[in-house]
């Protein structure tokens, strides 16, 4: 009986040399307003070349350089091989090869959509079959689309090369042995300092006694859960919280607050602390602060970080503060800048960099516990394995604190500052949370922008807009300036960044003098940026004007809010 196979199957086609960009990678697709779900993988700013170097093990600089431009990509690559595997192996998905454009970053470049079946079978996309636009600058992103509202999938993407190019043979990394002695030794290296343990031990004892305890996390995209899949279950904050519950909890007495916002530094973190950490009414007993890879964007180079730490330390319920230093794929973080704050206040500190970086460069059979490929989701964010390592590093600190004798409550108020934390009483001002000491004239900023950065807070299974109570000016609302008169010795202006061409610049004036121009296009994606309009002034009424820049008067501009000095209670 025939099984329906071909009578004369073709000989196999010889595979071209290839570069794996993504191998056995787990992604999470999020619900879109128009329906379905998507998972984008961003490849601009050298990230495509970095994938080829880190995962594909390409060392040829000429090949890596070709991957940085649209012209070079088409010269090097013959075809793109893609596979997607989901629990439901019969559904359809779409893969989008999205080139970024010169005239309009997101819209004027080539977009090639290919249908896939989610059974893990590879589909090869020849570049010769693509109708290329002339405006392409670089490979911007790979996007995976699904019909459902949420999906977790495992993907592979490789580049098959044109004749004349070669690439190293791809050898998959071994999985991490989380139960090995080598793993435990690696985690122990994350321990920087126990610091004064009295506040952390107080929270531990409360949890053991069945009293309510809240463990809170504030930081950037890593704290938000970027790279973990599914993020709300496997991000480091949730896993570390679970570890704390397992060690010390009694039933459901330990509570969780997560306030990570991608692409933001402690400059915004100190402003949103009351809303995002205290806003639900819980006063945290433990706060983990994670800005070690975000604070390059802090224009004060440490003032805002120390401000946030002091704001937490001096809270009336005296919470423990733990400083967590995460790391980028290039081994970089700001530990040397920020750890002196931990030393000055004798705080518990944990360094993921100290744990993992040295062993990255050991051979697989000579001490390496986890490779960069398995630790990093992209050049900025850890995978679920990486998030677990971060959580286990915090858990190691919890265990050390539990085992140590209790210290004496320190006199934090007697300590000198490391930087200049003048913003300790900073608060958020927006359309909703006003301030009696402020007089606002909206001018042409009469609309509310709803196209915002969305994040998953706490244990929410939905995304919340960041700073939704804003002021937006459009071409139709005119170009009258936004004016705020406020009694405060400093003022920070929070504005929206966007990669969309309809957003333009705005000029900021303080007491009639020009101070800065805010350019939403500088970063190239939708998120929030805080900038100091003025500081160190007399605590009297100052006038701040925000005017559309004359070059972009026909464009939109969004003011998300302000950070001002709240009168002390």
Label the predicted regions:
Residues 214-218, 223, 255-260, 285-291, ...:
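Structural recognition of the beta-strand scaffold that forms the well-ordered cores
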Residues 238-255:
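Signal peptide-proximal N-terminal region
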Residues 1-218, 223-230, 249-252, 388, ...:
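N-terminal secretory targeting modules
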Residues 290-294, 304-340, 344:
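Active-site segments of SGNH/GDSL-like serine hydrolases
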């Amino acid at each position: 009986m025939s099984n329906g196979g071909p009578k004369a199957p073709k000989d196999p086609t010889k595979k071209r040399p290839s570069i794996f960009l993504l191998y056995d990678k787990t992604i999470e697709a999020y619900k879109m307003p128009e329906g379905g779900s998507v998972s984008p993988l961003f490849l601009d700013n050298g990230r495509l070349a970095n994938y080829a170097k880190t995962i594909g093990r390409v060392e040829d600089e000429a090949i890596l350089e070709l991957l940085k431009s649209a012209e070079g990509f088409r010269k090097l690559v013959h075809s793109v091989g893609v596979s997607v595997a989901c629990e439901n192996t019969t559904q359809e998905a779409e893969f989008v090869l999205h080139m970024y454009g010169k005239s309009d970053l997101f819209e004027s470049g080539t977009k090639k959509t290919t249908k896939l079946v989610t059974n893990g079978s590879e589909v090869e996309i020849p570049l010769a079959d693509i109708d290329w636009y002339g405006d392409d600058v670089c490979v911007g992103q790979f996007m995976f689309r699904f019909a459902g509202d949420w999906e977790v999938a495992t993907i592979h993407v490789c580049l098959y090369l044109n004749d004349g190019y070669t690439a190293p043979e791809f050898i998959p990394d071994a999985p991490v042995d989380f139960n090995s002695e080598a793993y435990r030794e690696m985690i122990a290296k994350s321990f920087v300092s126990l610091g004064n343990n009295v506040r952390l031990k107080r929270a531990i004892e409360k949890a053991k006694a069945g009293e309510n305890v809240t463990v809170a996390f504030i930081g950037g995209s890593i704290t938000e859960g970027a790279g973990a899949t599914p993020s709300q279950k496997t991000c480091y904050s949730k896993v570390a919280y679970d570890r704390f519950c397992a060690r010390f909890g009694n039933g459901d007495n330990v509570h969780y607050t997560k306030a990570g916002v991608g692409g933001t530094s402690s400059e915004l973190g100190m402003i949103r602390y009351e809303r995002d950490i205290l806003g639900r009414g819980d006063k945290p007993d433990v706060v983990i602060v994670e800005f070690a890879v975000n604070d390059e964007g802090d224009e004060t180079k440490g003032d805002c970080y120390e401000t946030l730490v002091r704001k937490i330390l001096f809270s009336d319920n005296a919470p423990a503060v733990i400083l967590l230093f995460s790391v980028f794929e290039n081994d970089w973080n700001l530990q040397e800048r920020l750890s002196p704050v931990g030393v000055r206040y004798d705080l518990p500190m944990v360094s993921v960099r100290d744990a993992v970086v040295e062993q990255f460069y050991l051979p697989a059979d000579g001490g390496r516990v986890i490779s960069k490929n398995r630790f990093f989701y992209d050049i900025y964010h850890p995978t679920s394995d990486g998030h677990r390592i971060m959580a286990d590093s915090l858990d190691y600190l919890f265990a050390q604190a539990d085992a140590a004798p209790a210290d004496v409550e320190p006199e934090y108020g007697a300590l000198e500052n490391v930087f200049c934390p003048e913003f300790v009483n900073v608060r958020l001002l927006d359309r909703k949370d006003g301030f009696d000491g402020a007089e606002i004239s909206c001018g042409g900023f009469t609309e509310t922008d709803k196209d915002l950065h969305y994040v998953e807070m706490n244990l929410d299974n939905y995304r919340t807009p960041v700073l939704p109570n804003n002021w937006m000016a459009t071409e139709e609302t005119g170009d009258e300036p936004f004016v705020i008169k406020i009694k405060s010795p400093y003022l920070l202006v929070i504005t929206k960044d966007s990669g969309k061409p309809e957003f333009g610049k705005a000029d900021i004036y303080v007491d009639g003098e020009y101070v800065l121009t805010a350019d939403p296009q500088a970063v190239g994606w939708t998120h929030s940026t805080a900038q100091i309009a003025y500081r160190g002034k007399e605590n009297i009424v100052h006038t701040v004007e925000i005017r559309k820049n004359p070059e972009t008067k026909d464009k939109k501009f969004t003011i998300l809010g302000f950070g001002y000095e709240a009168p002390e209670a």
